[in-house]
A protein has these predicted regions:
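Catalytic core segments in nucleotide and nucleic-acid processing enzymes
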Residues: 68-248
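Interdomain/boundary linker segments immediately adjacent to catalytic/signaling cores
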Residues: 1-70, 242-248
């Protein structure tokens, strides 16, 4: 179409461009008019129900909801003084760890104690092959971070852990238990844990649902209408309202 328009004389081309522009603006206005309103923050009981659903199985949200819940759990799993220093919170599921130079979807670095903890969200069943692929990338990431880390301490001093958070870890053999792997001059502890196991270690779902502000900022706002593609927000609404019509 545009190739053919380019063959027209300038006055005709300009007129056609104005018409197309008006049509596009009308289409955008209609789309915005039909856009669903944002959901209010769910009540505590609904947050409990949502976390229970997420703990059971893959959320069928292309990894988006799984990763946002992993962010929420990771923050609560770390000391409060490190939470503001987290790298990767809320990042896109399409962002690569290599491009962001982080060892997991979210990373916490404690320079004072020379430790790094990364959390890698994985919806569904986790397999050894996935971890191996991630460790191959991790070697490149640590190579890039080597200068930064060496300024603080030698590689032997650093305590590095990657926690792989999935719904099912029963198929793991090589990494069925915490395993120390040598990666680019660093000893890295590989630890696989289920969503339900991590939730239990943090005091249980009921206790987690009480963190209203964190849930709002790390989960609710990130998957609400307007923040992600509409099908993801619809899936979030389904999970948050499942089996209860009065949720807010």
């Amino acid at each position: 179409l545009f190739a053919e328009l380019g063959k027209l004389p300038y006055p005709s081309r300009r007129h056609a461009g104005c018409l197309i522009r008006r049509w596009l603006c009308r289409r955008l206005d209609r789309i915005q008019e039909n856009k669903p309103e944002k959901l209010p923050l769910p009540a505590e009981k609904s947050r409990i129900r949502f976390l229970k659903q997420v703990s059971k199985s893959n959320t069928a949200s292309l990894g988006v909801i799984d990763q946002r819940v992993c962010d929420f759990l990771a923050v609560l799993d770390q000391p409060e003084e490190l939470r503001k220093k987290a790298r990767g919170l809320g990042s896109s599921v399409n962002e690569t760890n290599l491009s962001a130079a982080k060892i997991g979807d979210v990373e916490f670095v404690d320079y004072g104690n020379h430790s790094i903890v990364g959390y890698e969200a994985h919806g569904g069943q986790l397999r050894d092959e996935y971890i191996d692929l991630h460790l191959n990338t991790l070697a490149r990431i640590l190579s890039e971070k080597r200068l930064e880390l060496r300024e603080e301490a030698d590689p032997a001093v650093w305590d590095i852990t990657v926690k792989y958070v999935a719904h099912d870890i029963s198929s793991l053999v090589k990494y069925a238990t915490p395993t120390v792997v040598r990666v680019s001059d660093y000893d890295v502890t590989v630890l696989a844990i289920t969503y339900s196991g991590l939730m239990d270690s943090l005091g249980g779902i009921e206790g987690l649902a009480e963190y209203e502000e964190l849930f709002d900022s790390l989960v609710h706002e990130k998957v609400n209408y307007g923040a992600v593609p509409e099908p993801i927000s619809k899936r979030y609404y389904e999970l948050i309202s499942l089996s209860n019509s009065s949720i807010f």
